[in-house]
Amino acid sequence: MTQRLLEHPFVRGLADGTLDRDVFRRYVAQDAFFLRAFLKAYALAAAKCDDFERACVFHDLMTGVLDELKLHRSYSATLGIDLDDVEPYAATTAYTDFLLRVAWHGSLAEIIAAMVPCMRVYQHLGNELAASLRPDHPYEQWIKTYAGDDFGQLCARLESLLDEIASNSPAVHDAYRYAMQCELDFFSAPMESAP
């Protein structure tokens, strides 16, 4: 699945800087909508923690999402997006509905399993794309954000929690697999949808 994401036209366009600005604008709007749900899911995960240290990890992860939303707000000004008035695409709705359903009704392990793919995919893409980043790249800030050490550390902390508490339950595996498919669908939606 990761290889399919790397070969996806959206990611290839992001990598070489040829991604159409309108496609990126639509992506930023959808991602901001998604990140609000991601933030809520982290908050619900923190509420399910009996362990103080685990709750602190989710606090840091929520701070990371807020930092991502700040990046999106900076894009919104230059791209002409009202991030408070985003109509979600079907792929975005499917992903956020799944994420919030798991966050409300799933175990802590299931919530983490549903969230790790997003973190891991973005970190992996950021690192892969940063390897060939040129100075005048139009999406340089996006790439640097997800290739950065801060994001990488957050990703590692979430994965460490998953390793620590995950069981071999089918629900945990299913949540992870479905979230990976949602990532692929999410990258496709801005390319297929007209404003």
Please name every model-derived segment.
Residues 1-19, 156-165:
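Short alpha-helical hairpin
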Residues 3, 49-54, 170:
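Structural helix-adjacent loops and short alpha-helical linkers that scaffold large soluble proteins
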Residues 4, 18-48, 67, 113-123, ...:
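Alpha-helical bundle segments that constitute or directly flank the non-heme di-iron/ferroxidase center
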Residues 15, 19, 43-51, 104, ...:
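Short, flexible helix-adjacent loops and helix caps
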Residues 19, 26-37, 64, 150, ...:
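Short, contiguous, pocket-lining structural segments
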Residues 29, 53-150, 177:
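Active-site-proximal alpha-helical scaffolds that flank and shape metal-associated catalytic sites
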Residues 37, 41, 47, 112, ...:
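Domain-length accessory/inserted modules outside core catalytic folds
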